[in-house]
């Protein structure tokens, strides 16, 4: 209902077109502004909720001049949010609109989130790719054969100067796959992945594919690549609006903009030895594997990716039916960021004995978790995986609970200044009980928790007074985007303008 959409910030309406560039050949867009009338929720005029939208979001736009107008009975225009602020929203349209009459200037408009079916389609394609893969690759993924390793590197691995060098050498020694468990703050992307890339890049002609689940994580990979010296050439596959401005020059559309012939496109892609993108964006471009063979694919955030989402890439075929990816490295932490699915454990449990025998016990598990679980059962499989144990993010008192509950006490502090601070009277880990939502309410929002978060934010602001820095003093992490809107609403009610600038986001975005 409209009331529910307003409550969770899933709709913005009563918008007018300020500038219409829908007919532009390149980057057609619309600039929308509030109509000047206060946006109301059906449930309660006083319960204004801030919209739950951000740059890059896929949206649908439609005329909405009455409460009965919605996406099912009006013409829909698809696009993405270019930028938005409290005064205006810029929508980048997916298709140009030469007929100006379809977007009348005197009409009111609404935007809602778009539901994409490409993810489901790519998973079916991934399953087909798996069934069409070579027997050797299928046997590997189903644990029917042991992964192979270059034992000649054992001495170097044993004598490695530090954790990241050891892990990079183990990744190099792997002929099939390698798993890296990276608990929070251990540098799995900024240090471990970077070291792996440096190691593989030294091999003449080695082609590297870097993947992650979210665009924000791909930004972090690009940041790590940009810090490598001497500089390395890389191309990012993805859309402009989902890419940090610092790395847009590396986007494939910009890298190929000067190419006049198909041969030039092929040459540019073949010349670049590192390609980066989300699993979804690479899955959507299977032709890449016909253009070049990747010696290694490194997947960050691998524990967030379900098996069908990743199989299409790991089982992709290149020219002459050869495997598109030589070997793969999975980096993640199933204790910290498991895959997010709607079904509960009972609904996704696997009962087939043959599947259980190869480790497929629950469809909620990622490929990383299944392979890691299988490797742990073999005492001689130490070459298959490793774990980073030195973390530089949390104070030991903050890390204590997670360390004991999930990591068997193996996490050690690096010893950075903030980890050595005396806590004094500070309680670094507190639990606040909240009230559950009424039966039938969304599981992704909780009003009680939003009020608690706002109250604590006000306390932090008052304690820091003039020293409060919205960009550094306080951040609020919440599991779901729908809850972000509720927390922002409660903070807005406080009337403290500085708190409106703090970062409130999901676990994945902070990670």
What are these regions (language model features)?
Residues 24-173, 223-226, 231, 237-255, ...:
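Pre-ATPase regulatory/linker segments immediately N-terminal to the P-loop/RecA-like helicase/translocase core
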Residues 174-180, 205-207, 273:
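Pre-Walker A (Motif I) flank of P-loop NTPase domains
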Residues 210, 218, 222-295, 309:
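Conserved helicase NTPase catalytic core signature
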Residues 202-206, 214, 266, 280-282, ...:
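Conserved helicase motor core of SF1/SF2 NTP-dependent helicases
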Residues 45-48, 67, 76-79, 165-166, ...:
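Eukaryotic intrinsically disordered and solvent-exposed regulatory patches
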Residues 52-54, 58-62, 80-82, 90-92, ...:
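Beta-strand cores of modular interaction/reader domains in eukaryotic scaffold and signaling proteins
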Residues 189-204, 220, 224-226, 315-317:
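Walker A/P-loop NTP-binding motif
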Residues 174-198:
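Walker A/P-loop
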């Amino acid at each position: 209902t409209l009331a529910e959409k307003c409550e969770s910030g899933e709709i913005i309406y009563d918008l007018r077109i300020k500038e219409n560039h829908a007919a532009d050949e390149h980057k057609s867009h619309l600039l929308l502004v509030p109509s000047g009338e206060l946006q109301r929720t059906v449930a309660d005029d006083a319960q204004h909720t801030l919209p739950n939208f951000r740059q890059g979001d896929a949206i649908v736009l439609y005329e909405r001049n009455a409460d009965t107008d919605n996406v099912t009975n009006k013409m829909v225009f698809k696009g993405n949010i270019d930028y938005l602020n409290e005064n205006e929203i810029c929508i980048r349209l997916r298709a140009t609109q030469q007929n100006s009459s379809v977007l009348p200037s005197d009409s009111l408009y609404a935007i809602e989130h778009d539901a994409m079916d490409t993810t489901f389609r790519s998973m079916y394609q991934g399953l087909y790719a798996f069934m069409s893969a070579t027997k050797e690759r299928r046997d590997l993924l189903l644990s029917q054969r042991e992964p192979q390793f270059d034992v000649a590197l054992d001495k170097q691995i044993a004598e490695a100067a530090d954790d990241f060098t050891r892990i990079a050498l183990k990744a190099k020694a792997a002929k099939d796959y390698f798993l890296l468990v990276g608990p929070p703050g251990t540098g799995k992307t900024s240090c471990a992945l970077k070291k792996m890339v440096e190691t593989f890049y030294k091999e003449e002609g080695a082609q590297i594919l870097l993947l992650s689940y979210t665009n924000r994580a791909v930004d972090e990979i690009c940041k790590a690549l940009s810090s490598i010296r001497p500089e390395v050439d890389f191309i990012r596959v993805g859309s402009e609006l989902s890419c940090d401005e610092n790395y847009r020059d590396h986007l494939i559309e910009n890298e190929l903009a000067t190419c006049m012939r198909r041969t030039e496109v092929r040459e540019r892609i073949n010349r670049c030895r590192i390609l980066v993108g989300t699993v979804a964006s690479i899955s959507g471009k299977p032709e890449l594997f016909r253009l070049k063979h990747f010696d290694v694919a490194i997947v960050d955030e691998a524990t967030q990716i379900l098996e069908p989402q990743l199989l299409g890439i790991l089982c992709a075929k290149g020219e002459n039916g050869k495997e598109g990816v030589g070997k793969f490295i999975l980096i993640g932490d199933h204790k910290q960021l498991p895959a997010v699915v709607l079904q509960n454990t009972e609904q996704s449990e696997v009962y087939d004995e043959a599947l259980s025998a190869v480790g497929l016990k629950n469809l909620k598990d990622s490929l990383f978790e299944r392979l890691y679980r299988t490797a742990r059962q073999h005492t001689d499989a130490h070459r298959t995986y490793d774990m980073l144990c030195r973390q530089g993010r949390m104070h030991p008192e903050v890390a204590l609970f997670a360390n004991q509950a999930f990591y068997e006490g193996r996490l050690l502090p690096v010893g950075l200044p903030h980890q050595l601070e005396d806590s004094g009277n500070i309680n670094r880990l507190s639990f606040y009980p909240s009230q559950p939502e009424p039966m039938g309410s969304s599981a992704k929002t909780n009003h009680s928790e939003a009020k608690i978060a706002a109250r604590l934010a006000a306390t932090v602001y008052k304690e820091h007074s003039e020293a409060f820095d919205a960009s550094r003093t306080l951040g609020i992490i919440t599991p779901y985007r729908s809850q972000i809107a509720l927390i922002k609403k409660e903070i807005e009610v406080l009337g403290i303008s500085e708190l409106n600038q703090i970062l409130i986001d999901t676990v994945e975005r902070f990670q």
